[in-house]
């Protein structure tokens, strides 16, 4: 049996992975998979792939691109979610910030540098015409850390996926003052260089099996209940979220979308000027088309 270490954020986007791992299909192909939730987000996932703690990781596109550019030893093998991600822009419920214009110059909570919460804070500020040079960041590790940071007044603003934080907005702990969509597809499947060299067939079998699971899941009449029960989300929130999300139906790399991501990050001086799409991607020839 080939052991495969897989990881991602504990969010509803990864429901197809959870169903695949529970199905026993991979074991029939001689693969023993394990899943780890990374509450710290994409920056932590990129480091885990580099360190050998993960073989396959599901990362935010912008974080994967920046991680590879900074020398992390993994590649993008496929887009996983083709739709963009809607980030909620949150402040503490008792904040003096009444609308999104009020967050300019405030302290941003981020899970870590290079994470989606970090990059999207910069993308948002740039889109609003604000200076990005003087943005102050407070590293809080994860959503739990963000709640603590807000509670003790250590930060003022926090970007996180809007439905993941909706229960905190509903309870009155957070207030959402705005939203920002990513200007590119949101999640990619990444494979460590070491895993691809040593476990190539297991990796490719797993990725192909995942997309079969994605298509079964999307055709399922129970998908709303599955997500609601597994991730403890309200049914109406899952229904609203599903209207805007689109998983990739098959393994694919979209060079134009990756170039858009590179260009966006270059415009913010977050990646090297000489970064090219070819630097980011793994060989796709063995994956089903």
Specify the residue positions occupied by each region the protein language model found.
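Generic structural marker for isolated residues within well-ordered, non-membrane alpha-helices
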Residues: 22, 121, 165, 224, ...
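Pocket-lining segment of extracytoplasmic ligand-binding domains
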Residues: 144-228
